[in-house]
């Protein structure tokens, strides 16, 4: 039997693993490409993104632990709330490779819309199990709304650079 803190720490850290993998695409050429794009004046400074995502990932990870614990682990009852969570997390992790790697701003926007829908469904499913766990997702939902609008504006304002075009060397 693992120590009681192991599942709490493990499930809290899981979302950050994908965040670290996604960071691979948000560096070097991907970062130079993004810096060259037209962005609205209200886009967040780069230095804010790691603390924002670290907080959001930790909150959702801990929320998943609460749901997991309330439902007795990975049980049949946990299939929908934790399955939705896993689905939104996979869609979330897909965004950096789509946006920064493939430079497909329109597809990245579609991905964010899917993430937002599945994250909303996750929140509703978690609320039936644990309202406090669901509340841990509220800041994430707000950030997804902001990120979706930002992605739309960047896509709209850079329409000639949609198809994954690369900067000239």
UniProtKB/Swiss-Prot annotation:
Membrane topology: Multi-pass membrane protein
InterPro entries xrefs: TspO/MBR-related_sf, TspO_MBR
Subunit note: Interacts with TSPOAP1. Interacts with MOST-1. May interact with STAR.
Pfam families listed in its UniProt record: TspO_MBR
UniProt keywords, alphabetically: Lipid transport, Membrane, Mitochondrion, Receptor, Transmembrane, Transmembrane helix, Transport
Entry function: Can bind protoporphyrin IX and may play a role in the transport of porphyrins and heme. Was initially identified as peripheral-type benzodiazepine receptor; can also bind isoquinoline carboxamides. Promotes the transport of cholesterol across mitochondrial membranes and may play a role in lipid metabolism, but its precise physiological role is controversial. According to some reports, it is not required for steroid hormone biosynthesis.
Keyword Membrane: yes
Organism: Mus musculus (Mouse)
Record topology, Mitochondrial intermembrane segments: 1-5, 68-79, 127-134
Gene name per UniProt: Tspo
Transmembrane segments: 6-26, 47-67, 80-100, 106-126, 135-155
Outcome, altering residue 153 to S: Abolishes cholesterol transport
The name this protein goes by in its record: Translocator protein
Family per similarity comment: Belongs to the TspO/BZRP family.
Localization in the cell: Mitochondrion membrane; Membrane
């Amino acid at each position: 039997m693992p120590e009681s803190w192991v599942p709490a720490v493990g499930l809290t850290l899981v979302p950050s693993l994908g965040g670290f993998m996604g960071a691979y695409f948000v560096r070097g050429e991907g970062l130079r490409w993004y810096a060259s794009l037209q962005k609205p004046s209200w886009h967040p400074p780069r230095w804010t993104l790691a603390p924002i995502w670290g907080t959001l990932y930790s909150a959702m990870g801990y929320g998943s632990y609460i749901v997991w614990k309330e439902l007795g682990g990975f049980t049949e009852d946990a299939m929908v709330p934790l399955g939705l969570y896993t689905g939104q997390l996979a869609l979330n992790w897909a965004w950096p490779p789509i946006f920064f790697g493939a430079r497909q701003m329109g597809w990245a926007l579609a991905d964010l819309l899917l993430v937002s829908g599945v994250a909303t469904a996750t929140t509703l499913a978690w609320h039936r199990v644990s309202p406090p766990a669901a509340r841990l997702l509220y800041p994430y939902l707000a950030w997804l709304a902001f990120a979706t609008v930002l992605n739309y504006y960047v896509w709209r304002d850079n329409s000639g650079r949609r198809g994954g075009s690369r900067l000239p060397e």
